[in-house]
A protein has these predicted regions:
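Conserved alpha-helical scaffold segments that buttress catalytic/binding sites
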Residues: 1-209
Length: 209
């Protein structure tokens, strides 16, 4: 379980976990899948590593096999990235608008689609705090998922996936530039972690991995 920092850290996490699972003879090659609950793709071009392209680097370097994203905001997807997503058979995504505006599927169906898409191997579970409405983060949004949706996502993925890791990122207790504060950020993350741990413990016996 990794907490804090930017989503640029997803790349070394994916790389390290993949190589560790290979060394432990849990996988045939150093590669895992990822599910990301995020308002952004973090799949921008290879232009030097930053928080907006960690998953592109992980895929390019062979450490990430399949990538599923839930909750994308369509307004935040550049056309070149959207084209790449649609042309890549190893990527699956469901936008926020598909779920909550157009109601083409419900939230749990979207998460289940992601877990089914990535079920062939160990999967890293990612949660970017900016996906939750009005939570203080690096990219706070007035329109987004509820805290309950985020908790349901963590409960479902912990139960349904062969979990490689959990990464909760981009949240903030205070923004240095404007002084904005959220003294409940730590408490919110503690709910996320305990939901995930309790759900995963019910599925995987201790010391089984």
């Amino acid at each position: 379980i990794i907490i804090g920092g930017g989503h640029n850290n997803a790349y070394p996490i994916i790389k390290g976990v993949s190589k560790g699972l290979l060394k432990a003879d849990k996988v045939p090659l150093a590669q895992i899948n990822c599910i990301n609950l995020d308002a952004h793709t973090d799949y921008r071009p290879l232009e030097g590593r930053h928080s907006g392209n960690a998953f592109r680097y992980a895929e390019t370097d062979g450490f990430m096999g399949k990538y599923a994203v839930v909750g994308l905001h369509e307004n935040y997807i550049p056309q070149n990235v959207l084209t790449d997503l649609n042309n890549n058979p190893f990527i699956q995504y469901t936008s926020y608008e598909e779920i909550f505006v157009h109601e083409r599927k419900n939230f749990i169906q979207a998460v289940a689609h992601a877990t089914g898409f990535t079920e062939d191997t160990f999967t890293g579970i990612e949660l970017d705090m900016d996906v939750v409405e009005n939570v203080l983060s690096s990219a706070c949004s007035p329109s987004g998922l509820s805290v309950l949706h985020a908790r349901q996502y963590l409960n479902f993925t912990a139960t349904d996936c062969k979990v490689a890791y959990l990464h909760i990122c981009e949240g903030a207790a205070q923004i240095a530039d404007d002084g904005a504060k959220n003294e409940e950020a730590g408490k919110l993350i503690s709910f996320f972690v305990t939901d995930f741990v309790k759900a995963n413990s019910n599925v995987i016996p201790p010391n089984s991995i």
